[in-house]
Amino acid sequence: MPLLDGDLEGSGKHSSRKVDSPFGPGSPSKGFFSRGPQPRPPSPMSAPVRPKTSPGSPKTVFPFSYQESPPRSPRRMSFSGIFRSSSKESSPNSNPATSPGGIRFFSRSRKTSGLSSSPSTPTQVTKQHTFPLESYKHEPERLENRIYASSSPPDTGQRFCPSSFQSPTRPPLASPTHYAPSKAAALAAALGPAEAGMLEKLEFEDEVEDSESGVYMRFMRSHKCYDIVPTSSKLVVFDTTLQVKKAFFALVANGVRAAPLWESKKQSFVGMLTITDFINILHRYYKSPMVQIYELEEHKIETWRELYLQETFKPLVNISPDASLLDAVYSLIKNKIHRLPVIDPISGNALYILTHKRILKFLQLFMSDMPKPAFMKQNLDELGIGTYHNIAFIHPDTPIIKALNIFVERRISALPVVDESGKVVDIYSKFDVINLAAEKTYNNLDITVTQALQHRSQYFEGVVKCNKLEILETIVDRIVRAEVHRLVVANEADSIVGIISLSDILQALILTPAGAKQKETETE
């Protein structure tokens, strides 16, 4: 019986509920009558049709008038229940168009349904629009199998091999590998600019625009600073009105080495308070163990900044979370700083503090997935990485105040401790100086380095050594695993030869291959 177009929607919504009734495969129409009469829910579009049938009459699926107007009859949409799958656990509310089992409904068995319909029936089934084919547009090979399954011969297992399926009137389907590039392109098009940049590391092997030596540079350029920010981390912020002494105690209590400085008057971050500031205060105001360091006890951070910076005031060096890691590495090395705060330019919030160690560890995690440049197999002597001339060092009996003077004058972050025979026995870094604040022993800086190192934390990094004949790949792996900031280059006699730092390694891995671009940036 022809129905209005409005009934087409209503019948489609309830077709899955009707077809799941138990019925024999040889009598499709009888199975629908076994449910008993069910009045249709009222709808504005089906109102003109309702007077033609009584509310208690069953809904006939295959009336004889079906042949008179096949394009207008929505009852052929109930064929989805006749072609039953092998599973009997399908829910009445399940939608074959979206479930994986719906793909097999029309490719299972036309013989088991027991239909004796006219030759035009299969054509009409393929034209029905109950199931939106748009949901399969990401899998074209399965879509073709879905369309021609109703007019294909009985199931021969070809649905599991889309590439072998052939239609008498259509060419064979393409192999699934044919669609792999289109899927990757569709994925890249669907992602935003930030996420699309993350996919660049997967295409390193196909890039021919640059040499293989620039693979790490391209990796850092394709990742943003936000990618390296951990899910959970601690960030301590100091107001410039806080006393210097309390600020350093807070660094020790929270186990951090630096903190951004917030100035309430400007409502912005104006600088960083690091262990270097603590060393500079001790170096500048320490007189003797008998004289208290008044400036450390009473000065506020803003007072110290005014006295120390004076005419050398510089704005805070920071970076946006949307900037590339290549820009972060370049900013760290160019400005000769060890900590780079990541500040959101919109909200003004500080998100994280980038360091050489964090960046190199991030890069090392993905090194195994990237092509290995040739220079990774070269040793330190061939590459010339590190400092091998005029190495600053101290002895075990060197006073702390002298070590602090070397830190300030040479602008270095660590001093190897060498015994009388020339062997490296320990290392005294800037981070060890903060223990003076923890122990409240900064009033007596005449004690020896050995005495000061006795109070060192149990998490001491230790002296990690290497030699000049080790390749760069080994050096990177060792410094990342040891979680240290530098390696002492020693010879066979365990005597100091040089120092290789994190900045030296990042320079060799990232900036040296990108030297031409960095020089252009410097000139600008």
UniProtKB/Swiss-Prot annotation:
Annotated positions binding AMP 1: 272-277, 317, 338-339
Positions bound to ATP 2: 257, 339, 357, 429-432, 456, 485-486
GO CC term (a single one): nucleotide-activated protein kinase complex
UniProt: ADP 1 binding residues: 272-277, 317, 338-339
PROSITE patterns to which the protein is assigned, alphabetical: CBS
Region ranges (Disordered): 1-178
Example of a GO MF term: AMP binding
Domain text: The AMPK pseudosubstrate motif resembles the sequence around sites phosphorylated on target proteins of AMPK, except the presence of a non-phosphorylatable residue in place of Ser. In the absence of AMP this pseudosubstrate sequence may bind to the active site groove on the alpha subunit (PRKAA1 or PRKAA2), preventing phosphorylation by the upstream activating kinase STK11/LKB1. The 4 CBS domains mediate binding to nucleotides. Of the 4 potential nucleotide-binding sites, 3 are occupied, designated as sites 1, 3, and 4 based on the CBS modules that provide the acidic residue for coordination with the 2'- and 3'-hydroxyl groups of the ribose of AMP. Of these, site 4 appears to be a structural site that retains a tightly held AMP molecule (AMP 3). The 2 remaining sites, 1 and 3, can bind either AMP, ADP or ATP. Site 1 (AMP, ADP or ATP 1) is the high-affinity binding site and likely accommodates AMP or ADP.
Protein name as catalogued: 5'-AMP-activated protein kinase subunit gamma-2
Species the sequence originates in: Pongo abelii
Classification lineage: Eukaryota, Metazoa, Chordata, Craniata, Vertebrata
